[in-house]
């Protein structure tokens, strides 16, 4: 008799788990595409370079409030972000070449 009650308890737990899984499936999942993320990253790199270039132009024109250390920091940030973008591109190209060389 206790074995039957144990089995019924397990069945109830499984049904509860199945119901919660169905509830989670019905929630809309945000769609984040790889292409969208890549485009956003490229935009951030471009924005960083534009900001650094603007700071350098302001410093060159001797505008008040623009210090050399700010310009150097912005230029270094732009350089690092560009190098990161290049490395990501290199990894993507290497992965693409590896996939293309696989035999089907």
UniProtKB/Swiss-Prot annotation:
Disulfide bond sites: none
Lineage top rank: taxon: Bacteria
Pfam families, per the entry: FliE
Record-level Gene Ontology MF annotations: cytoskeletal motor activity; structural molecule activity
Chief location of this protein within or outside the cell: other
Gene Ontology BP terms: bacterial-type flagellum-dependent cell motility
Compartments where found: Bacterial flagellum basal body
The keyword Transit peptide belongs to this UniProt entry's keyword annotation: no
Signal peptide, first to last residue: none
UniProt KW GTP-binding keyword: no
Entry's family note: Belongs to the FliE family.
Protein name listed in UniProt: Flagellar hook-basal body complex protein FliE
Organism from which the protein derives: Shigella boydii
